[in-house]
Amino acid sequence: NNPENWITYPKTAIPIWVNLISMEKLPEHKILENPSIEKASNNEINLSSHQFGLNFDYDQFPNDFIYSYSSEYSESPLLQMSVIRPDGIKLEIISTSLPYSNLKIIHEDRIFSTDAMIKKKLSLQSDLFDFEIKKLSSENIIFSKTTSNEPLKGNYIFSVNLYEIENSSEIIESNLIIGGKAFGIMGTDELRRDLAIGLLWGTPLALFIGLVVSIASVIMGLVYGVYAGFKGKKTDETLMRFNDVIYA
């Protein structure tokens, strides 16, 4: 029951099979865990890059996005995140320096779509859109057409680059979560718990209880009937009438 275990799941998501019968295709929750990794360096600058590909083919915007990563570095490298959209436009999402350290450390962090730095960075690129984006969420800007605030379908490439001068640094591992409205075969609850897992955990206990109750019912009925037949006369009649009342 540790909420930390469910943070990568969406809140109150519907089952993914609903998209098979729905006229409007809702965005599925995506957890991208296998990025393309590139490393490069020249005489001064070292680069560690992770890229995530996403095929977005839905009729609504995603709920949010979360980028989780761990990096190894010293001093204060620069982390930049951008996305190349299906229309060829490249949007800069965030550019920030990681916390300074004299020694080589492993730093873990998450970047949420609600981060004020992301919203500010996207607002500086408002001239790419034909409508006002000031009041829109980050995900609604990134996944929007430039002519109207409607989902732009196609392939997206999210790139995360870690730059450091002279010293070597790298992104050890990372994943990108695109928050959707459909997840798994049973969906999730308001605490992000996968309902299918709860069903699997509860099934053995439910089967055990059902089996015990059914066997106990048969044994009780057998004993009841044998005793009524053995005693006969008024005892049998009384027990049968009592049985009729219970069944009624």
Q: How would you label these PLM feature ranges?
A:
Residues 208-209, 220-248:
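Cytoplasmic-entry segments and transmembrane alpha-helices of multi-pass inner-membrane transporters
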Residues 1-210:
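Gly/Trp-centered helix-boundary motif
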Residues 215-219:
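Hydrophobic alpha-helical transmembrane bundles that constitute the permease/transmembrane domains
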